[in-house]
Protein backbone atom coordinates (compact mmCIF):
# COMPACT_ATOMS: atom_id res chain seq x y z
CA UNK A 1 0.00 0.00 0.00
CA UNK A 2 2.85 2.39 0.81
CA UNK A 3 4.34 2.29 -2.69
CA UNK A 4 0.97 2.76 -4.36
CA UNK A 5 0.30 5.83 -2.23
CA UNK A 6 3.81 7.15 -2.84
CA UNK A 7 3.27 6.92 -6.61
CA UNK A 8 -0.18 8.48 -6.33
CA UNK A 9 1.28 11.30 -4.22
CA UNK A 10 4.01 11.95 -6.79
CA UNK A 11 1.49 12.06 -9.63
CA UNK A 12 -0.79 14.38 -7.66
CA UNK A 13 2.18 16.56 -6.72
CA UNK A 14 3.08 16.77 -10.41
CA UNK A 15 -0.10 18.75 -11.10
CA UNK A 16 1.32 22.26 -11.19
CA UNK A 17 -1.48 24.66 -10.41
CA UNK A 18 0.69 27.63 -11.39
CA UNK A 19 1.32 26.23 -14.85
CA UNK A 20 -2.24 25.00 -15.41
CA UNK A 21 -3.79 28.28 -14.24
CA UNK A 22 -1.38 30.34 -16.33
CA UNK A 23 -2.34 28.32 -19.42
CA UNK A 24 -6.06 28.54 -18.69
CA UNK A 25 -5.97 32.30 -18.23
CA UNK A 26 -3.38 33.25 -20.82
CA UNK A 27 -0.99 34.47 -18.13
CA UNK A 28 2.77 34.14 -18.64
CA UNK A 29 4.29 30.71 -17.97
CA UNK A 30 5.76 31.09 -14.46
CA UNK A 31 8.73 28.88 -15.39
CA UNK A 32 9.92 31.36 -18.01
CA UNK A 33 8.71 34.65 -16.50
CA UNK A 34 9.22 36.55 -13.27
CA UNK A 35 11.40 34.53 -10.91
CA UNK A 36 11.08 31.41 -13.07
CA UNK A 37 9.40 29.51 -10.25
CA UNK A 38 6.11 27.66 -10.73
CA UNK A 39 4.62 28.67 -7.40
CA UNK A 40 2.20 31.03 -5.70
CA UNK A 41 4.68 33.86 -5.09
CA UNK A 42 5.64 34.11 -8.74
CA UNK A 43 1.99 33.84 -9.75
CA UNK A 44 1.31 36.84 -7.52
CA UNK A 45 3.95 38.80 -9.43
CA UNK A 46 2.79 37.61 -12.86
CA UNK A 47 -0.97 37.14 -12.68
CA UNK A 48 -2.28 38.83 -9.55
CA UNK A 49 -3.73 37.94 -6.20
CA UNK A 50 -6.62 35.72 -7.36
CA UNK A 51 -4.47 33.29 -9.34
CA UNK A 52 -1.80 33.34 -6.63
CA UNK A 53 -4.39 32.33 -4.01
CA UNK A 54 -5.76 29.58 -6.25
CA UNK A 55 -2.22 28.33 -6.84
CA UNK A 56 -1.50 28.38 -3.12
CA UNK A 57 -4.69 26.48 -2.26
CA UNK A 58 -4.06 23.88 -4.96
CA UNK A 59 -0.47 23.37 -3.83
CA UNK A 60 -1.51 23.08 -0.17
CA UNK A 61 -4.16 20.50 -1.03
CA UNK A 62 -1.86 18.33 -3.11
CA UNK A 63 0.50 18.12 -0.13
CA UNK A 64 -2.28 17.49 2.36
CA UNK A 65 -4.43 14.91 0.58
CA UNK A 66 -1.85 12.11 0.18
CA UNK A 67 -0.89 12.33 3.86
CA UNK A 68 -4.53 12.22 4.97
CA UNK A 69 -5.11 9.23 2.71
CA UNK A 70 -2.00 7.50 4.09
CA UNK A 71 -3.30 8.05 7.61
CA UNK A 72 -6.74 6.75 6.62
CA UNK A 73 -5.31 3.45 5.37
CA UNK A 74 -3.27 2.99 8.55
CA UNK A 75 0.26 4.01 7.62
CA UNK A 76 2.41 5.16 10.54
CA UNK A 77 3.55 8.81 10.82
CA UNK A 78 6.93 8.15 9.22
CA UNK A 79 5.31 6.45 6.23
CA UNK A 80 2.79 9.29 6.01
CA UNK A 81 5.67 11.77 5.90
CA UNK A 82 7.45 9.84 3.13
CA UNK A 83 4.21 9.77 1.13
CA UNK A 84 3.95 13.53 1.60
CA UNK A 85 7.52 13.97 0.43
CA UNK A 86 6.57 12.15 -2.76
CA UNK A 87 3.94 14.85 -3.36
CA UNK A 88 6.61 17.52 -2.83
CA UNK A 89 8.93 15.68 -5.23
CA UNK A 90 6.12 15.76 -7.77
CA UNK A 91 5.87 19.51 -7.31
CA UNK A 92 9.62 19.96 -7.69
CA UNK A 93 9.94 17.61 -10.68
CA UNK A 94 6.50 17.26 -12.29
CA UNK A 95 6.28 14.44 -14.80
CA UNK A 96 3.57 16.31 -16.72
CA UNK A 97 5.68 19.45 -17.24
CA UNK A 98 9.13 18.17 -18.28
CA UNK A 99 10.24 17.94 -14.64
CA UNK A 100 10.32 21.76 -14.32
CA UNK A 101 8.38 22.61 -11.18
CA UNK A 102 8.33 24.94 -8.22
CA UNK A 103 10.20 25.07 -4.95
CA UNK A 104 7.76 22.99 -2.91
CA UNK A 105 7.07 25.33 0.01
CA UNK A 106 3.27 25.40 -0.21
CA UNK A 107 3.06 21.67 -0.98
CA UNK A 108 5.32 20.98 2.01
CA UNK A 109 3.11 23.21 4.17
CA UNK A 110 0.05 21.22 3.12
CA UNK A 111 1.86 18.00 3.91
CA UNK A 112 2.81 19.33 7.34
CA UNK A 113 -0.76 20.50 8.01
CA UNK A 114 -1.94 16.93 7.59
CA UNK A 115 1.01 15.32 9.36
CA UNK A 116 1.25 17.48 12.51
CA UNK A 117 -0.83 20.66 12.48
CA UNK A 118 0.96 22.49 15.36
CA UNK A 119 4.24 22.26 13.41
CA UNK A 120 2.46 23.66 10.35
CA UNK A 121 1.14 26.56 12.44
CA UNK A 122 4.67 27.24 13.68
CA UNK A 123 6.05 27.20 10.13
CA UNK A 124 3.26 29.38 8.74
CA UNK A 125 3.59 31.84 11.62
CA UNK A 126 7.36 32.04 11.12
CA UNK A 127 6.90 32.47 7.37
CA UNK A 128 4.35 35.28 7.81
CA UNK A 129 6.48 37.09 10.41
CA UNK A 130 9.68 36.80 8.36
CA UNK A 131 7.90 37.89 5.19
CA UNK A 132 6.31 40.83 7.01
CA UNK A 133 9.69 41.97 8.33
CA UNK A 134 11.77 41.34 5.18
CA UNK A 135 9.26 41.26 2.28
CA UNK A 136 11.26 38.29 0.96
CA UNK A 137 9.40 35.05 0.31
CA UNK A 138 12.48 32.87 -0.13
CA UNK A 139 14.02 34.00 3.16
CA UNK A 140 10.71 33.36 4.91
CA UNK A 141 10.66 29.79 3.55
CA UNK A 142 14.29 29.17 4.46
CA UNK A 143 13.67 30.28 8.05
CA UNK A 144 10.25 28.68 8.56
CA UNK A 145 10.98 25.18 7.28
CA UNK A 146 13.81 24.19 9.67
CA UNK A 147 11.97 25.69 12.65
CA UNK A 148 9.57 22.74 12.56
CA UNK A 149 12.29 20.18 13.27
CA UNK A 150 12.68 20.67 17.05
CA UNK A 151 8.91 20.51 17.56
CA UNK A 152 8.68 17.37 15.44
CA UNK A 153 11.63 15.81 17.32
CA UNK A 154 9.71 16.34 20.52
CA UNK A 155 6.13 15.49 19.47
CA UNK A 156 6.41 13.32 16.31
CA UNK A 157 9.92 11.84 16.45
CA UNK A 158 9.15 9.13 13.90
CA UNK A 159 8.54 11.86 11.31
CA UNK A 160 11.82 13.66 12.04
CA UNK A 161 13.98 11.87 9.45
CA UNK A 162 11.64 12.47 6.50
CA UNK A 163 11.03 16.06 7.63
CA UNK A 164 14.79 16.64 7.81
CA UNK A 165 15.06 15.32 4.25
CA UNK A 166 12.22 17.67 3.26
CA UNK A 167 13.99 20.63 4.86
CA UNK A 168 17.18 19.82 2.96
CA UNK A 169 15.20 19.51 -0.29
CA UNK A 170 13.65 22.94 0.19
CA UNK A 171 16.99 24.55 1.07
CA UNK A 172 18.57 22.90 -1.99
CA UNK A 173 15.74 24.11 -4.21
CA UNK A 174 16.33 27.66 -2.91
CA UNK A 175 20.09 27.59 -3.60
CA UNK A 176 19.88 30.35 -6.24
CA UNK A 177 17.85 32.45 -3.80
CA UNK A 178 20.55 31.93 -1.17
CA UNK A 179 23.19 33.21 -3.60
CA UNK A 180 21.00 36.23 -4.38
CA UNK A 181 20.31 36.87 -0.69
CA UNK A 182 24.02 36.90 0.15
CA UNK A 183 24.76 39.11 -2.87
CA UNK A 184 21.93 41.53 -2.00
CA UNK A 185 20.06 40.81 -5.25
CA UNK A 186 17.07 38.81 -3.96
CA UNK A 187 13.63 40.05 -5.05
CA UNK A 188 11.44 41.75 -2.46
CA UNK A 189 7.76 42.63 -2.45
Swiss-Prot record:
GO molecular function, one term: acyl-phosphate glycerol-3-phosphate acyltransferase activity
Family the entry assigns: Belongs to the PlsY family.
Pathway: Lipid metabolism; phospholipid metabolism
Source species: Pseudomonas entomophila (strain L48)
UniProt keywords, alphabetically: Cell inner membrane, Cell membrane, Lipid biosynthesis, Lipid metabolism, Membrane, Phospholipid biosynthesis, Phospholipid metabolism, Transferase, Transmembrane, Transmembrane helix
GO biological process: phospholipid biosynthetic process
Lineage: Bacteria, Pseudomonadati, Pseudomonadota, Gammaproteobacteria, Pseudomonadales
Complex and partners: Probably interacts with PlsX.
Summary of the function given for this chain in its UniProt record: Catalyzes the transfer of an acyl group from acyl-phosphate (acyl-PO(4)) to glycerol-3-phosphate (G3P) to form lysophosphatidic acid (LPA). This enzyme utilizes acyl-phosphate as fatty acyl donor, but not acyl-CoA or acyl-ACP.
Catalyzed chemical reaction(s): an acyl phosphate + sn-glycerol 3-phosphate = a 1-acyl-sn-glycero-3-phosphate + phosphate
Gene Ontology CC: plasma membrane
Membrane topology summary: Multi-pass membrane protein
EC number per UniProt: 2.3.1.275
Predominant place of localization: membrane
Pfam family, one: G3P_acyltransf
Domain of life per record: Bacteria
Compartments it resides in: Cell inner membrane
Protein name (database record): Glycerol-3-phosphate acyltransferase
Ranges that cross the membrane: 1-21, 50-70, 81-101, 111-131, 151-171
Amino acid sequence: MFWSLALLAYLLGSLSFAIVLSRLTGSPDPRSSGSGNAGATNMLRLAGRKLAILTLLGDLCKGMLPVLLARQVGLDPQEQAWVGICAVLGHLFPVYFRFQGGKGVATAAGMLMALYFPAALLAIGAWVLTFYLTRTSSLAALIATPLTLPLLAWREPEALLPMTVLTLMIVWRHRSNLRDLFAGRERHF
